């Protein structure tokens, strides 16, 4: 129950950061102004002489107070160093500084508002600083920084508040009760310090629950564009959030704290209300005397300066101990900001992260990516490590050492993500991480858990064997390895080691690469339980002359002859003057199924949806879910009591499935308000239809509907395609039209459209499974020209499901392929134009592939070309583990 309340509170604070910050500041100013000139008018040193306060201070007291202040400043300094573990000393340092400053101001305002004595503030300031604990702020920031988007930032802050809120509340209560015992001591200085301490704890609690999460949410929101549109917190060293179960408090400790709180409440009640024998008036008089406020002791004087000048002079005038304290604070601040770990600051500067190759420690080197010895700082030799076979052998002492980027890399197999032309290979990147010696044998799980939960240490202080040990013991979920490790790559490496032990052939993963890949773009977006990446050859076909422009089309495939054949088709189209294309329709669909009590009720709902009034109501609800989604059409069908509704809407440059699904849910909720007896069976009732052959996609269309045409001169048909127009038309009729009809095909009136569609989809980060519907195509050929010797060809594709934002298009290699075509990302001037342009390119490339394959079939070259170009010449018996070798 409490966790749910704190979660709701955290979500509200993170979702409205400006309102919370402005409200907190306004409340502070209001409390200060309400009491500044309307409270107690007796101000010692300005309009009253207070002899009680003119006491001689021993030199030993001054020394002790100065030492205490310096310790408090050093404590705060080390707290800020802990915040550096999150990666950015500026973002979190400012947030921590705001927390400290706001807590101090709020404490001062509260005490002033309650008319308390402030003469003990000088002595109590170190006590206040020592009460500040930024560990919880650091933990909450970790939750926020493990996010991939601003929406996830809010959710993670809410989740962090749900976990940390109850614990922090109980701790604040216990601290107040413990410190509050000092207010009953009868010693004036101790009472003032303890009173101030209680106020500080409450102020820290207030700021942590309101100001700090709002500030973190706002800072991350403002910095979301600092890395070319990608959130700055996507860096690997920002994603070190701990497992939720590890953050949850120990129930035994919580029960002890609650029992302690109850006991302290009884102590306070007995001391203040039951055991106090003094009359009320006597108590009041005594308190006045003890605080130096007695009328007979204080003497009124005429102020010589105004009140603000009096306060300003008090702030400016400093003793020698205050000078020492201020000097130490300034020295540490300058050291922290300008001279400490400049390398860390440079790696987090607002430059393109792609231009700086990430140098990380390779835990278990793979032969497939790095075959040369690795260089180590100080000319230290790397220990030879065994291959990733999953077989446990006696481990030597592991040493995590910083690497140097090699400048001489002959015969080096690497995988570079991003714009390699921007890389400066002559620069030497050296991390300043100290060497960490790890034990020979894995330590106990309890010790490993403590190290993992330590903000100053973390997973990098644990060996791979210890991490594997924690995973096997269920202390770390295997699916969260990337999140918990200091780098995503190490998490993938450990998962591979875990998997290798379970495989019949432990060396199976040897040639599946995993290094030098930006997994931060994969996590939470593209794939789970990652064990590497699949390098697929990418060829280029072109130039494709389409609508007066030339395109070099990337195609990822392992089928020989496909790119070459498509390239020949592009050449033929170019020699014929190019192709023309149009987008006929644009609308992604989602087809939910609902059920009503009777078939007649379903008919009534269907009739209502087909009215202009019903459509307007549903459209308003649907369109409210997105600034791009605009409902264009409803197609309904009935099967008994079931009603199938096909929502069709534009989705901008996104493929649009998630966007349309969100709008569909909202529209169904609105429909349920009008027909309460309606039951929603599924948001997808296969009436869309997605990733399945369906006549409705072929007839009604889905995604982008495109058509492309070209005229190929007879000379080009003879010299480039090596056939005749009559032969190609004859094959097209009997193969693509009659043959497909005999097979009962739906949308398969083509030679091999799926080949080209899938190759482009894989290269450009599309959903490869959607080639089922996207490959719907009819290829038509006719004789044209004055002598009917030229070839007219057209391809019509009614359901190209494609997008240029979201999903796999966020990965850098896929973005590179989209940039080749000039359609990467969203079109700012005309939303959706990039996706439509990509659909036209797909249709034009399909036509090029159709042209070349049909020519090969007409000329009888298909089998011959595949025998030459599509058969491996490697002797499989020479390969280790080949089936032919084993059976021989």
From Swiss-Prot:
Residues annotated as glycosylated: 281, 296
GO molecular function: hydroxymethylglutaryl-CoA reductase (NADPH) activity; NADP binding
UniProt-listed GO biological process terms: cholesterol biosynthetic process; coenzyme A metabolic process; isoprenoid biosynthetic process
Membrane topology: Multi-pass membrane protein
This protein's name: 3-hydroxy-3-methylglutaryl-coenzyme A reductase
Cross-link (Glycyl lysine isopeptide (Lys-Gly) (interchain with G-Cter in ubiquitin)): 89, 248
Compartments reported by the entry: Endoplasmic reticulum membrane; Peroxisome membrane
Keyword Ubl conjugation: yes
Positions of the SSD domain: 61-218
Entry PTM: Undergoes sterol-mediated ubiquitination and ER-associated degradation (ERAD). Accumulation of sterols in the endoplasmic reticulum (ER) membrane, triggers binding of the reductase to the ER membrane protein INSIG1 or INSIG2. The INSIG1 binding leads to the recruitment of the ubiquitin ligase, AMFR/gp78, RNF139 or RNF145, initiating ubiquitination of the reductase. The ubiquitinated reductase is then extracted from the ER membrane and delivered to cytosolic 26S proteosomes by a mechanism probably mediated by the ATPase Valosin-containing protein VCP/p97.
Side of membrane Lumenal, spans: 40-56, 115-123, 188-191, 276-314
Regulation of its function: Regulated by a negative feedback mechanism through sterols and non-sterol metabolites derived from mevalonate. Phosphorylation at Ser-872 down-regulates the catalytic activity.
Modified residues (Phosphoserine): 872
Active-site residues, Swiss-Prot/TrEMBL: 559 (charge relay system), 691 (charge relay system), 767 (charge relay system), 866 (proton donor)
Transmembrane segment boundaries: 10-39, 57-78, 90-114, 124-149, 160-187, 192-220, 249-275, 315-339
Family of the protein in this entry: Belongs to the HMG-CoA reductase family.
Coiled coil feature spans: none
Catalysed reaction, written as an equation: (R)-mevalonate + 2 NADP(+) + CoA = (3S)-3-hydroxy-3-methylglutaryl-CoA + 2 NADPH + 2 H(+)
Chain span(s) of sequence motif INSIG-binding motif: 75-78
Annotated metabolic or biological route of this protein: Metabolic intermediate biosynthesis; (R)-mevalonate biosynthesis; (R)-mevalonate from acetyl-CoA: step 3/3
Topological domains, Cytoplasmic: 1-9, 79-89, 150-159, 221-248, 340-888
Subunit structure, as described in the record: Homotetramer. Homodimer. Interacts (via its SSD) with INSIG1; the interaction, accelerated by sterols, leads to the recruitment of HMGCR to AMFR/gp78 for its ubiquitination by the sterol-mediated ERAD pathway. Interacts with UBIAD1.
């Amino acid at each position: 129950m409490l966790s749910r309340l704190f979660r709701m509170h955290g979500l509200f604070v993170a979702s409205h950061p400006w309102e919370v910050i402005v409200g907190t500041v306004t409340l502070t100013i209001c409390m200060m102004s309400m009491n500044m000139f309307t409270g107690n008018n007796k101000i010692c040193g300005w309009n009253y002489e207070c002899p009680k306060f003119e006491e001689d201070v021993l030199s030993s007291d001054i020394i002790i107070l100065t030492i205490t202040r310096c310790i408090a400043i050093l404590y705060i300094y080390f707290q800020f160093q802990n915040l550096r573990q999150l990666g950015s000393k500026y973002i979190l340092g400012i947030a921590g500084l705001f927390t400290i400053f706001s807590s101090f101001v709020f404490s001062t305002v509260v005490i002033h508002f309650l008319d308390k004595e402030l003469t003990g503030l000088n002595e109590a300031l170190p006590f206040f600083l020592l009460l500040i604990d930024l560990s919880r702020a650091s933990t909450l920031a970790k939750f926020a920084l493990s996010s991939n988007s601003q929406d996830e930032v809010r959710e993670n802050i809410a989740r962090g508040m749900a976990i940390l809120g109850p614990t922090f509340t109980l701790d604040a209560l216990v601290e107040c009760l413990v410190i509050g015992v000092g207010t009953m001591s009868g010693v004036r200085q101790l009472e003032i310090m303890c009173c101030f301490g209680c106020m500080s704890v409450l102020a820290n609690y207030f700021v942590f629950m309101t100001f700090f999460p709002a500030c973190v949410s706002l800072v991350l929101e403002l910095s979301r564009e600092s890395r070319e549109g990608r959130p700055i917190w996507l860096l690997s060293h920002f994603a070190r959030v701990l497992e939720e179960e590890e953050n949850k408090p120990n129930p035994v400790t919580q029960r002890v704290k609650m029992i302690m709180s109850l006991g302290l409440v009884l102590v306070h009640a007995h001391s203040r209300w039951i055991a106090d024998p003094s009359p009320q008036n006597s108590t009041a008089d005594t308190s006045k005397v003890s605080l130096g406020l007695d009328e007979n002791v204080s003497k009124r004087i005429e102020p010589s300066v105004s009140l603000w000048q009096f306060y300003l002079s008090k702030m400016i005038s400093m003793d020698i101990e205050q000078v020492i304290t201020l000097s130490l604070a300034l020295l540490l601040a300058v050291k922290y900001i300008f001279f400490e770990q400049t390398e860390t600051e440079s790696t987090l500067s607002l430059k393109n992260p792609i231009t700086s190759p990430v140098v990380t420690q390779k835990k278990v080197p793979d032969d497939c990516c790095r075959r040369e010895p690795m260089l180590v700082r100080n000319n230290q030799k790397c220990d030879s490590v065994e291959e990733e076979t999953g077989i446990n052998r006696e481990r030597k002492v592991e040493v995590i050492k910083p690497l140097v980027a090699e400048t001489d890399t002959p015969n080096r197999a690497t995988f570079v993500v991003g714009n390699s032309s921007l890389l400066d290979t002559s620069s030497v990147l050296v991390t300043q991480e100290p060497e960490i010696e790890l034990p020979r044998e894995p330590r106990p799980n309890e010790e490993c858990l403590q190290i993992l939960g330590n903000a100053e240490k973390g997973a990098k202080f644990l060996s791979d064997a210890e991490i594997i040990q924690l995973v096997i013991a269920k202390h770390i979920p295997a699916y969260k390895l990337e999140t918990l490790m200091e780098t995503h790559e190490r998490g993938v490496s450990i998962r591979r080691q875990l998997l290798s032990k379970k495989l019949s052939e432990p060396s199976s993963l040897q040639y599946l690469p995993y290094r030098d890949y930006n997994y931060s773009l994969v996590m939470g977006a593209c794939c789970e339980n990652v064990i590497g990446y699949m390098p697929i050859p990418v060829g280029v076909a072109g130039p494709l002359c389409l609508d007066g422009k030339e395109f070099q089309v990337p195609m990822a495939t392992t089928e020989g002859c496909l790119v070459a054949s498509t390239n020949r088709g592009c050449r033929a189209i170019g020699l014929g003057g190019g192709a023309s294309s149009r987008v006929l329709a644009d609308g992604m669909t989602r087809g939910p199924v609902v059920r009503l009590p009777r078939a007649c009720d379903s008919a009534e709902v269907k009739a209502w949806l087909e009215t202009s009034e019903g459509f307007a109501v549903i459209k308003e609800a649907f369109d409210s879910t997105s600034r791009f989604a605009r409902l264009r059409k409803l197609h309904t069908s009935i099967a008994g009591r079931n009603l199938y509704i096909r929502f069709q809407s534009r989705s901008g440059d996104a493929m649009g499935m998630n966007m349309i699904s969100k709008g569909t849910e909202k529209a169904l909720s609105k429909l349920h308000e009008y027909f309460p007896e309606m039951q929603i069976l599924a948001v997808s009732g296969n009436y869309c239809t997605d990733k399945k052959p369906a006549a409705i996609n072929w007839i009604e269309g889905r995604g982008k509907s495109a058509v492309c045409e070209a005229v190929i001169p007879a000379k080009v048909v003879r010299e480039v395609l090596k056939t005749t127009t009559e032969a190609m038309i004859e094959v097209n009729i009997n193969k693509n039209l009659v043959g497909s009809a005999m097979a009962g095909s739906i949308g398969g009136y083509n030679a091999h459209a799926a080949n080209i569609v899938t190759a482009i989809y894989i290269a450009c980060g599309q959903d490869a499974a959607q080639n089922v519907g996207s490959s719907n195509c009819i290829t038509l050929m006719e004789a044209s020209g004055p002598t009917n010797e030229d070839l007219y060809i057209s391809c019509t594709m009614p359901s190209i499901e494609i997008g240029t934002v979201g999903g796999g298009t966020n990965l850098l290699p896929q973005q590179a392929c989209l940039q080749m075509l000039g359609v990467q990302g969203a079109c700012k001037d005309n939303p959706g134009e990039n996706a439509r342009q990509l659909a036209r390119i797909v249709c034009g490339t399909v036509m090029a592939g159709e042209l070349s394959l049909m020519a090969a079939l007409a000329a009888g070259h298909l089998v011959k070309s595949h025998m030459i170009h599509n058969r491996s010449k490697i002797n499989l018996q020479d390969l280790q583990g080949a089936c032919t070798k084993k059976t021989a």
